[in-house]
């Protein structure tokens, strides 16, 4: 369950439309996808050959921290973590495992949606650090969902080796 935008900048004087866009995509989008998938996952866990099903939500390392200039983004990612844990507790006895992947810097277009001055700030912060690739996140998801049915890996925090926070 992965959809998101990262529109960074100070809270004071921020375009509220950017906040609404992040909340709509990062939170509401994830909620609606989970809601649509859950009946199918519950059925698969009950009737499928593995007797377990997996819902994996993608958050961010930003769901564990808070930084100046990313307050609303942090809010959306913290919310994904809280939702995932609540849902996990709600459906765990029905053999649907809920996992949360929290990636650090990944080489995607995510930062490119920001205003030019913010893109420059992101570039300075991460410099020439080698970012992860999408396949690194896919490997983490694969690990999570291929555990035996009696094992639930509920969270994976994954960062580039050089990423400080």
Label for each model-derived stretch:
Residues 60:
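Residue(s) in the substrate-gating loop at a strand-loop-helix junction
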């Amino acid at each position: 369950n992965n959809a998101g935008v990262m529109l960074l900048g100070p809270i004071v004087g921020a375009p509220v439309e950017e906040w609404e866009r992040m909340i709509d995509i990062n939170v509401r989008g994830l909620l609606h996808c989970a809601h649509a998938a859950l009946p199918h996952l519950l059925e698969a866990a009950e009737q499928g050959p593995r007797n377990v099903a997996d819902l994996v939500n993608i958050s961010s390392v930003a769901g564990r921290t808070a930084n100046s200039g990313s307050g609303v983004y942090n809010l959306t990612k913290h919310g994904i973590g809280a939702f995932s844990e609540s849902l996990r507790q709600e459906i765990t006895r029905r053999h649907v495992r809920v996992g949360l992947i929290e990636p650090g810097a990944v080489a995607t277009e995510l930062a490119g949606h920001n205003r030019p001055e913010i893109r420059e700030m992101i570039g300075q912060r991460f410099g020439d650090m080698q970012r992860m690739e999408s396949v690194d996140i896919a490997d983490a998801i694969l690990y999570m969902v291929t555990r035996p049915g009696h094992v639930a890996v509920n969270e994976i925090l994954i960062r580039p080796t050089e990423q400080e926070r």
